[in-house]
Amino acid sequence: MRKSTKQFTFGAVLLCLLAGGGYFGYQQVFTKGLDRLSKKVCDDAVARETVIRALPDSRSAEQAAKQNGSGTSYTFSCRIATSGDSILSGEAKIQDTSERTWVDFYGSHAGTALLRSSADGVEALAQLDNHHGTASVYVPCIPRGVQASAASESYALVTEARAIGDTRSTGTPLRQVVTDFAYQIAKHAYTSGECRTPRSFPKELPRYKAH
C-alpha cells in the first residue's frame, strides 16, 4: 500500500511538472511575439513597451519603418502587426496647417468630444468614438530649406496613429497609449525631418483624464 502511495505521489508531481512545462512552452511559443521585438522598434523611434501596452499577446509580431522625402515632402511611418491581425501604425508628415485647423479637422470627424493634452508647445488629441483609437500629435516645424512665409497657414509636423483589430485596452487607456505611440514617432520625425528650431521634448505628455 505504501509503495502504491509513493507511486501515486511521484506520478502526480510528474504530471504537475509536465503541465507546468507545457504551459511555459505554450506561453513562449504562442504569447511572446511582442516580447521578441527589439527594445526599440521602427528605427529606434518607439519603445517596445509602448507597443506591448497597446496590442494583445500574440505568437509573432513584425515591425516596419519607412522614411521618404525631405522638406515639405517629408514622411515617416511605423507599423507593428501581430499574427493575430492586431495592428498599431502611425505616420508623421510635414503639413501646411494651423493648430486650429488641425483641431477642427479631427473634431469634425470624431462625432463626439476630443481628448486633449499639451506641453511645451506640443499638442495632442484623441477621438472619443466607439471604434479603434485614433490619436494625433501637432508640433510646429519649419523644415530645413523651407521659408516659413511660403505657408498659407503654418508648417507643422503632424503625426496620426491608430490601433486596428484587438487591443489590450479600450476607452481612454487605449487613446492614451496610441497617443504615446504617436508622440514617440513625432519626436523621432522632428529630428529626421530636419525641423529647424531646436526643441526639447518632455519625456511624455500629460495624461488624459478618464472618461
Give the residues covered by each predicted segment:
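A small/polar (G/S/T-enriched), proline-flanked helix-loop surface module common
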Residues: F30-F181, A186-K187, T191, P198-A210
